[in-house]
Structures are given as structure tokens and as C-alpha cells.
């Protein structure tokens, strides 16, 4: 995955703060993608990526459940860009077993990462949620959605070491899932996609419409700090 930039010659642009400057991220490709735990079955094409999950793969660290699961495949790029958004559409039509999931990830190391996905639960509902792991402890924020939802868009936005995760049903109107701080996410980072099946199951996760944009998460201009 590669980003090529065209820099505006103006010193500032409407809606951009001074630290951001004015950078247009133009070109997105799959060159430069790197696996953390390469799966046995996958496909990387010009317009889609497919991952067939393997049973008993997962990401979680310590909190509540006490186990440390760190074997899900993650496909990522590296960047030092401090302000950008990453968008992807996920199709998980083949999922049908508890905890089957696929979505976006920013995996720095086993104890510092985030992810967002839909986790299948049963024929009635599934969990749309996100996990943020800082210094070895995961949290999980979720909401229940109908089990017949089979696609979801995600947008991950970065503002230095702060991040915003959003989701969308149509790829046009995005809703905030969470805002978070990554203690180790202020410099060079890795981010991309993941898929896994924590129990004894497998499904094909399909990722399309991957794109980079200027940071869609604008600087805060509301209430001033005390």
C-alpha cells in the first residue's frame, strides 16, 4: 500500500490547521503491504483483498477474560503521516459462527493496537464494536446490530497520536464509534485490515474500496480547555 502526495503551494487552506499543512494524498495501491502472521489462504488484487480465516485466531489482551490471544492475521502499511483517513468496505457474508469478524486494524505490537469490526453472535444479532489496547490491556466498546447486516464501511482517522473510528452502511454517511488515544501511536505506525475466527470456524472476508484521504476528522473548535 503506497501513498503519493501532492503538496499545495499555499501556506494554508480553509479547514486545515497550521500543523497539518495542506497535503492531498492521491494514490493508493497495494504495493508495500506487509503481513503480521500471513494466513494460508488469501488473495490481493488491484480492487479487492480476500482473507480466509483460520480457526482459533483472535486479538485480545488480558482484560476481564484474562487470556492473551495474539494470532490473527493483519495486513498493513507503514506511514509517518500525522493527519489522514483510511477507508475500507468489508463484506462478511460468509460469516456465521460466533465471534467471526473482519475489519480495520492498527497493530503496532502485541500490547498496543486497535481494531474495529462486526462480530457475529447468533441468528438474531451481532456486535458492531471496537477494541483499543494500550500497554497490554484491551477494552471493548460495542452495540448490537441485526444479524442480517452483511457489509460495513469503516473510516480510521489520525490526528498525531489521537484516532477516530467511524462506520457507515453506505460509505457516504459515517457515524462515530469512538475517539481514542494510542500511547505508542505518535510516530511511525502500521495500519490496515484483519480477519479472524476465534472459535472453530472459517469464512472468507472481502475488503474493497480501500482509499486514503485527507483527514476527515477535523480539529476540535468547540469548548476550550480549562
Task: Indicate where each model-derived feature is located.
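Extracellular glycan-recognition regions
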Residues: 22-226
